[in-house]
């Protein structure tokens, strides 16, 4: 069942203003129809990309209860209410013919109506007949049509947002071939819908708006929306508005007292600012987007709270360094000031990065702060780990200090995507932090820290390449495990290289020995005097022992 994002009583964001009892009844009939194949759209519409309404027509047989005209039809209708066939734009009671159409899954034989005690009214089993009825495109809801048309093996359209007369979709890639049909069906089936758009690109970090594609209806993006008892008017194509955040807006506003002061750093069109001002709070609101600023000023006037709000159109960093700084000096040092100070930072893609400007914001001032501002900063926590811990680490990283003694609350806001949640971290700006007395960790290469902190924990591509190179080198190193496995290919190669080195080393040593021996022989011949002739019988024998010793040494 598709869920829309207009606040309700039982199903959040269901888009239907109804009571608990009637909503449960609608759900009961919805699932009852889903369990009956005869009440499904024709199977032939599967894969349809251009809407053909006539292709949804089908004829089925269903049970009917024929009521005698002398009986009270209204009483019997009330008694048989749970057995009625309820479908979109189909009347189960035909007053002129005194005929009641029953659900084929609930009534298959006369005994199924035993609890109605029809015999006491002189109505017998002959009153139950099976007759054909014609079902058309108009008799199915949009979610039943999508279930019949879209691919059965892939995720169907699960949700959408309703902003005034605009239906805002965020179609996944596999649904894009069906976008025209989806837009037309939604425009046909949802009351007050005049425009259907699809988000075509991601939200721009500068102005928090996105490019959209018109799927069906009028290109009219001026809307009027009610939220938290306030009226907002804006051009949806130029500003950021998310109805899924209405509950979060309400939570923050309920924290505020009449005497409190609110600094809204990314005010948008005023979902925090306007209801806070209606409570009597003093609000300093800022937004960089000129269209958001214009809508903010207009919405303050529209809700008659302009006297409580000061609007600015500038960069959030400049707003912190000037307007917020000056206001903090005035309010935090004023002994007569009542109420608390709150700072909302609802720009989850980059709000945590602006926390770096708060430590030491008042370091050049010789003041004593009597108030500790409470910051509500929003961020995206990505990963499978504890999202609250990830959000806390993000805040501590950009704030440069531990927030254990400053932390008030870490709250889940909404799920954005698989393994990606929007979180709120509420913490106090202490006097030591604002005056620069708290030691702040230095961040190197801050421009490289823009991704989520947990992303930085993962090995970079450069590190992965280094690891691959080290692994390749490690493969050529002799290891004991290779010997155990019998893989001696690399071992043989290394051992043969070592043998060659040892042989070459021995040859060099032997050559040096020969050179030394040759030098000794030459020097002895040069220093020895000419020999005198001796008698033959007294001829001296050569000293062979020394020569043998030298030869043995060379061989060694």
From Swiss-Prot:
Annotated spans, Disordered: 444-465, 524-556
Disulphide bonds in the chain: none
GO cellular component: cytoplasm; mitochondrial matrix; nucleus
GO biological process: mitochondrial tRNA methylation; tRNA N1-guanine methylation
Stretches with biased composition (Basic and acidic residues): 454-465, 540-549
Assembly notes: Monomer.
Binding-site residues, S-adenosyl-L-methionine: 249, 287-288, 315-316, 346
Protein's UniProt name: tRNA (guanine(37)-N(1))-methyltransferase
């Amino acid at each position: 069942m598709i869920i829309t994002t207009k606040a309700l009583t039982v199903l959040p964001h269901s888009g239907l203003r109804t009571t608990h009892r009637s909503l449960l009844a609608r759900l009961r009939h919805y699932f009852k129809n889903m369990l009956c194949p005869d009440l499904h759209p024709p199977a032939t519409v599967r894969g349809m990309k251009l809407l053909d309404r006539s292709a949804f027509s089908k004829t089925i047989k269903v049970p009917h209860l024929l009521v005698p005209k002398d009986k009270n039809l209204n009483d019997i209708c009330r008694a048989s209410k749970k057995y009625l066939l309820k479908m979109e734009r189909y009347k189960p009671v035909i007053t002129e013919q005194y005929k009641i159409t029953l659900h084929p899954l609930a009534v298959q034989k006369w005994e199924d109506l035993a609890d109605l005690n029809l015999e006491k009214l002189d109505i017998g089993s002959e009153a139950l007949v099976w007759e054909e009825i014609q079902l058309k495109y108009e008799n199915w809801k949009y979610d039943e049509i999508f279930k019949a048309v879209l691919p059965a093996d892939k995720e169907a359209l699960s949700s959408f947002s309703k902003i005034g007369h605009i239906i805002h979709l965020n179609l996944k890639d596999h649904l894009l071939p069906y976008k025209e049909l989806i837009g037309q069906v939604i425009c046909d089936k949802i009351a007050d819908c005049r425009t259907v758009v699809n988000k075509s690109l991601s939200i721009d970090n500068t102005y928090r708006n996105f490019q959209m594609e018109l799927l069906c209806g009028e290109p009219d993006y001026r809307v009027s929306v009610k939220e938290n008892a306030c009226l907002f008017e804006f051009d949806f194509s130029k500003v950021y508005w998310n109805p899924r955040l209405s509950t979060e807006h309400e939570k923050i506003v309920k924290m505020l007292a009449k005497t409190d002061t609110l600094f809204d750093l990314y005010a948008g069109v005023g979902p925090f600012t306007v209801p806070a001002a209606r409570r009597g709070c003093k609000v300093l609101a800022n937004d960089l987007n000129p269209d958001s600023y214009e809508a903010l000023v207009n919405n303050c006037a529209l809700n008659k709270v302009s006297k409580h709000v000061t609007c600015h159109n500038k960069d959030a960093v400049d707003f912190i360094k000037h307007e917020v700084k000056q206001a903090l000096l005035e309010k935090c040092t004023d002994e007569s000031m009542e109420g608390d100070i709150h700072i909302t930072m609802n720009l989850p893609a980059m709000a945590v990065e602006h926390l770096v400007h708060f430590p030491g914001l008042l370091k050049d001032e010789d003041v004593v702060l009597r108030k500790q501002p409470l910051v509500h900063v929003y961020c995206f926590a990505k990963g499978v780990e504890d999202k609250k811990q990830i959000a806390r680490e993000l805040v501590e990283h950009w704030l440069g200090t531990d927030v254990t003694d400053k932390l008030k609350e870490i709250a889940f806001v909404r799920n954005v995507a698989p393994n990606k949640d929007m979180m709120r971290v509420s913490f106090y700006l202490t006097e030591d932090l604002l005056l620069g007395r708290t030691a702040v960790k230095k961040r190197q290469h801050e421009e490289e820290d823009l991704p989520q902190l947990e992303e930085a924990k993962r090995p970079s591509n450069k590190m992965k390449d280094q690891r691959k190179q080290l692994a390749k080198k490690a493969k050529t190193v002799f290891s004991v495990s290779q010997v155990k496995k019998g893989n001696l290919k690399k071992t043989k190669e290394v051992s043969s290289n070592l043998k060659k080195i040892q042989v070459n080393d021995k040859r060099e040593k032997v050559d040096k020995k020969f050179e030394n021996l040759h030098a000794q022989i030459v020097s002895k011949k040069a220093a020895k005097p000419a020999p005198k002739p001796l008698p033959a019988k007294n001829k001296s024998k050569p000293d062979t022992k020394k020569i043998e010793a030298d030869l043995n040494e060379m061989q060694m």
